[in-house]
């Protein structure tokens, strides 16, 4: 006969393993804290924006150029990451960072149907992230007229005072560690209860054998 576990019995088994439910989540919390504060590199991100916009007075011409500029944004996002731009950025930063290093720090994004390019730079220093982002925007806006034969780029906003820590995120990591510890504890309890076939109580004897218990023998040391 298959035995069923009611809610009170389930809660009883959980209470029986309360030490495990406390120790493993706390252990996960401790491990996450150690990793977050001592092993993960701190990263700061700074952002600047580039506007792709041809100056003009005729409204009809401007409307056409807006669509043209939007189509060019994807091309410009690739130009920002090109060796021509990044090599010059590296040179103007006194070769403190190589082209590949700058490329690994750089992320270029834009919203759909937008003329704005977002340039994000991540490094181990907020001030360095700001400096590199500003230099990329400056070099790009200077080089585009020569590359594309059109002067339709301007710096919309600089990266000054935008540097902020983006990694690690200790609170998120601590919560994740706590949850992982709790899940592991519950899995251990579940596996232990499923594979432990021993009969431990009078109720389990009655449920398993469907006969009344006449008496019990106490354990002697």
From Swiss-Prot:
Recorded hits in Pfam families, A to Z, give: Wzz
Question: Single GO cellular component annotation?
Answer: plasma membrane
Q: Which domain of life is it from?
A: Bacteria
Recite the UniProt keywords alphabetically.
Capsule biogenesis/degradation, Cell membrane, Exopolysaccharide synthesis, Membrane, Transmembrane, Transmembrane helix
Q: Can you tell me where the transmembrane regions are? A: 20-40, 171-191
Q: Does the keyword Transmembrane apply?
A: yes
State any GO BP term from the record. Answer: polysaccharide transport
Subcellular location, in the record's words?
Cell membrane
Kindly give the membrane topology term recorded for this protein: Multi-pass membrane protein
* Gene Ontology molecular functions: carbohydrate:proton symporter activity; protein tyrosine kinase activity
Pathway assignment reads: Capsule biogenesis; capsule polysaccharide biosynthesis
Similarity remark: Belongs to the CpsC/CapA family.
Quote the function comment for this protein: Required for the biosynthesis of type 1 capsular polysaccharide.
Query: What's the protein here called?
Result: Capsular polysaccharide biosynthesis protein CapA
Native organism: Staphylococcus aureus
